[in-house]
Amino acid sequence: QLTGALVTHYHPDHCGGSFGQNTVEGVSRLLEHVSLPVYAHELEADGVRRVTGISEQGIKKVTSGDKLMVGDIDIEFLHTPGHTPGSQCFRVKNTLVSGDTLFIDGCGRVDLPGSDTEDMFRSLQRLASLPDDTLLLPGHNYSAVPHATLGETKRTNTYLKIKDPETWKMM
C-alpha cells in the first residue's frame, strides 16, 4: 500500500510539474488517485507547491534527521542543500537515494537559480562521511552503471575527491 511520496527537490523532473513548454506528470497526478502526504524539506515545500500545484496541506514538511517509519522500514531525511536550498537525500539502512545532490560521476548543477556552491561542497563532504559500503542510488544515471557503493564513488568522482573549499570554488 502506498503511504506517501518522497521528494528530493522541487525541480519538475523530480516531483512533476511544468517547465518551459514541457510538463512532467508527478505527485499532482498521483494525488488525483490517492490521498497521501508528500514529504519535502521545509525549505523546498513552497517550490514543490509552486511547480506541482498541490495544496500546502498536501505537503508534509521535514528537516534533516527526521525519520519516517513505513512498516519496518526506517527512512531518514538528510538535508543536502546546494543544487537547491532544500535538496534532500533519503537514507534507508545502507542505501542512499541522492536525488540531484550526488551522482556516480558528478553532482547536481550549482549554476541554477537558488543553487549554492558552498552548500553543495558541505553537502558532498557530509555524504562522503557515510560508510563506504553504502549503496548510492542517484536521481539520474549519467554513468556507465546505474548505482555504485559510496566507496567506489569516492574513488572515481572528482567532486568527492576535493577536500578544500577554495579548490571547490574553482571547479
Language-model-detected regions and their locations in the chain:
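Short loop/turn motifs at secondary-structure junctions
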Residues: Q1-L2, D132
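Metallo-beta-lactamase
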Residues: R50, I54, D74-H79, T84-E166, ...
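Active-site HxH/HxHxD metal-binding segment of metal-dependent hydrolases
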Residues: L2-I73, R155-Y159
